[in-house]
Amino acid sequence: MTYRDCFFYALALAGFVGCAASCANLMSCELPDTGRVTVMSYNTQTFFDADECGNEFDEFKGGKSAWSEERYLARLDRLKEAIVLGGEASGMCPGVGPDVVVLQEIENAGVLRDIGGRFTSAGAYPYAAFVPQESGGAFSIGLLSRFPVVAVRAHQTVSGGVFLRPLVEAVLDVRGTELTVFAVHWKSKSGDESSAELRLEQEVLLDRRIRALEAVCPGALWIACGDFNQTMDEFTVLSGYANGWNSFAVSESEPVLSSAVVSGKSTSGIPVSGLSASGVCGSYYYNGAWEGIDHFFASCSLVDGSDAEIGGFRTVYGGRLLASSGEPARYEIFSGKGYSDHLPVVIAIEAWN
């Protein structure tokens, strides 16, 4: 096993939010400062653009494919819808997504630009970061942010000559304080039994980067999120860190985050001990059961009760994100319907000054 570190520039998305003449005004618009920072993570399920490059999955390319420009644009609209639902679930104003959105399975920076272009005015995302996939890879991780992206770094695990998906490390300037976001999309469980070993290598890499950050900056504020492709009981070295499913998810009896809840610790989450009212208890549905494989980990400084603090964690299942069966409404290319086979997860960080 070897590691390779790469640096990538963040994308300035000023051009997304309107014509060139109006960008400055749009970027100066601000949402009310509630003292809260909201973050969403979402595996978008094979989000390719409409231009064929050869790396797409078979069903997305070729003359017989049902994939088209029209269906791509429709998927962008649905992704915006999911992001807005994530905003509502984390207490943002109506029609506004979370402050930071981490997306997995994005084909390229162009897709990130296209989705960013669907958010305007005070709800716009002026900043973004995207780490290109390795040659031959189908997709990677993208990040949209209302806060300046100070730095982006990618770390990759190479095992048996195969580059695993990168660990993205983005530093955001959140109202004068740095927040480091580690974003991942780990090896899936499909294939042979070696996938568990590969995920362990990715877990060790993330732990190594967290320890390196905390060694240089004790008390650093950081979160780690994404599709980890494993549940809480399958972690090894990360099991000692606070996690949304067991550390800052709250009981169903507590009030749901809404735009009216702008202070204090009143938050909501999907309990891991039982089903929610909708039957949802996880972010992914597999083999007849819910699994919590999309995670948020957080630094000790965000859960120790001092200053900025994780106020809550929840799965987003509103709108049409669930199929009539009660499972995630996965995207089906043959019909052009659906969203993703995962549900978004969100957190709210309270008392951020």
Predicted features and spans:
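Active-site beta-strand/loop signature of hydrolases that rely on acidic residues for catalysis
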Residues: 39-44, 72, 79, 83-112, ...
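Short, solvent-exposed loop/turn and secondary-structure capping segments
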Residues: 50-54, 112-118, 140, 153-156, ...
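Bacterial N-terminal signal peptides
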Residues: 9-20
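Structured beta-strand-rich core segments of catalytic domains in phosphoester-bond hydrolases
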Residues: 44, 100, 106-187
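Metal-dependent phosphoester/phosphodiester hydrolase catalytic core
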Residues: 53, 173-208, 214
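Bacterial N-terminal signal peptides that target proteins for export
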Residues: 1-10
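N-terminal, active-site-proximal structural segment of metallo-dependent hydrolase catalytic domains
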Residues: 23-118, 129-134, 323-337, 350-353
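Metal-dependent phosphoester-hydrolase catalytic domains
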Residues: 24-28, 208-222, 230-353
